[in-house]
Every structure is written in structure tokens, then in C-alpha cells.
Regions:
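Sequence-pattern detector for short linear motifs
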Residues: 5-6, 177
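Bacterial Sec-dependent N-terminal signal peptides
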Residues: 4-5, 12-44
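Segments that shape or occlude catalytic/ligand-binding pockets
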Residues: 30-245
Length: 245
């Protein structure tokens, strides 16, 4: 069974936090030359490439605060480690916006955007870069009944400069995926959308603009990532029962 860094994507999918957008304009002309050029090629990356990325874990304590980081980025924060009824010290951020400014390298282009609230009325945020959803970029907050922020967890993907204008149109990407799976991208539980996903490059993860094909029926499905600039299939992930294969 495949495990490691990239396997976490399956967990995010099952939690329903992976972002999706529309299927795009299917009336666009297909670039048959590009489709032919990439047809039959194996995906650029395997799960071993993702598992080879170093993971540096760090835990910081400050008063009642406990902050967990992975590769220098905050992944989990608890402001009340002394118990639910204890007063946090130092005082936690008053709002989600204050939290993001303090703990994450958000920019005018790279933002956390409110998504919804769960059954406890705690807010969930999803990450967007220049209006394009970022795979695995999300944050969940937890609040006390009095409105005090208790903590949160999630993931923020730093992105410097990235061209979000695809060279490959949606129709061409759909055809590339259909050739790869030898089937249709139409049907229940299937969709394809433009997004941003990080892939291995020189020992670290670097974001790329991609088309994501998602097929999900209950706990079984697959993902295919197509480079939105070159048309190459970058990665293929299948999962069943929440576990990748």
C-alpha cells in the first residue's frame, strides 16, 4: 500500500476539503497535435517522488500556545493547552484574518477564502491563488462558545510567482485524460477543473498550474493531474476505501 506525503491527498478528499470548479468550455477546439505528442506517455511522477521529499517537524510552546510546523509552515495551533476552560495566554488572535496575517505568508494574490461552517459553526477556509483554487490548501478553525479562538489546523501552500493562464485549453485536457484512462470524463462522480498543485522539483515541492480529473464514487476513485502548460500527465492516483493504491 502506498503511504507518505502524497497519500494525505486522499484524506483531504474524503473530508471534502479539496476544491473544485466548473468543467470549463467543452466547445473549445482540441489541440490534436498536443494530444498526439503526449499520448501513451507514462506520468512524470510516482508516489515515491513525493515520499522522497524531506519532512522537517517542529513544535513550539509559548505560554498556553502550542504550534506545530512542517517544513517551517504552521500546520496546527492550539491556544488553550491547559484545558477547555482555561484562559489562553498570550491572548489568541481575535479574528481569522488576524490569524492568517500572523501565522501564514498570505499575500494579495495568495489568500485564504471563507468556504463554509461545520455543524459546530466553526469556519472553514480554502486557499486561492489569483482566483485559482490550490489543492490541499485549507484551514479549519475551532472556537469556544464565548467566541474565543481555541485553535485550528490545515495547510497553506506558499506561491511566489505562477502563471495562471493555461497554454492547454479545457477541451484538450479532457481529451488527454480520456486517452489516458481509455474512457470518458463524463458521468456521475466525474469532473475536470483548473487548479494549482505542488510537485517535486530539486528536493522540494513546487506549485504548478494543472487540470485535475477527479472521479469519486463513495470511497473509491482516482485523480489525474495534467500540466496546464505542457499537456503532460504529471501524476495518477487511485484510492479505495480511503487508501491509495
Amino acid at each position: 500500500m502506498r503511504k507518505g506525503l502524497f497519500a494525505s491527498l486522499v484524506t483531504l478528499v474524503c473530508l471534502g476539503v479539496v476544491m473544485v470548479s466548473c468543467n470549463g468550455d467543452i466547445d473549445e477546439d482540441i489541440d490534436e497535435g498536443m494530444v498526439f505528442a503526449v499520448n501513451g506517455q507514462e506520468p512524470v511522477f510516482t508516489y515515491k517522488d513525493f515520499d522522497a521529499i524531506p519532512q522537517d517537524y517542529e513544535e513550539i510552546t509559548n505560554g498556553t500556545w502550542k504550534i506545530k510546523k512542517v517544513n517551517g509552515l504552521v500546520r496546527q495551533v492550539s491556544f488553550c493547552t491547559d484545558g477547555v476552560d482555561a484562559a489562553p495566554s498570550p491572548a489568541p488572535p481575535m479574528t481569522e484574518e488576524e490569524f492568517f496575517k500572523e501565522f501564514m505568508p498570505v499575500t494579495a494574490d495568495n489568500q485564504m477564502v471563507f468556504y463554509d461552517r461545520d455543524y459546530r459553526d466553526d469556519p472553514h477556509y480554502l486557499q486561492y491563488y489569483k482566483g485559482v483554487p490550490v489543492e490541499q490548501g485549507f484551514w479549519h478553525f475551532y472556537f469556544h462558545e464565548d467566541g474565543t479562538m481555541h485553535g485550528g489546523d490545515g495547510r497553506f501552500i506558499p506561491i511566489g510567482q505562477l502563471d495562471v493562464n493555461p497554454s492547454v485549453n479545457m477541451a484538450t485536457a479532457r481529451k488527454i485524460v480520456e486517452n489516458f484512462i481509455d474512457g470518458s470524463v463524463e458521468g456521475e462522480g466525474k469532473r475536470i477543473y483548473l487548479s494549482i498543485m505542488s510537485f517535486p522539483e530539486n528536493g522540494e515541492l513546487k506549485p504548478r498550474l494543472v487540470y485535475v480529473y477527479k472521479r469519486q464514487v463513495w470511497e473509491e476513485g482516482e485523480f489525474i493531474y495534467v500540466d496546464a502548460q505542457t499537456g503532460r500527465v504529471l501524476y495518477h492516483l487511485g484510492y479505495m476505501g480511503g487508501a491509495p493504491y
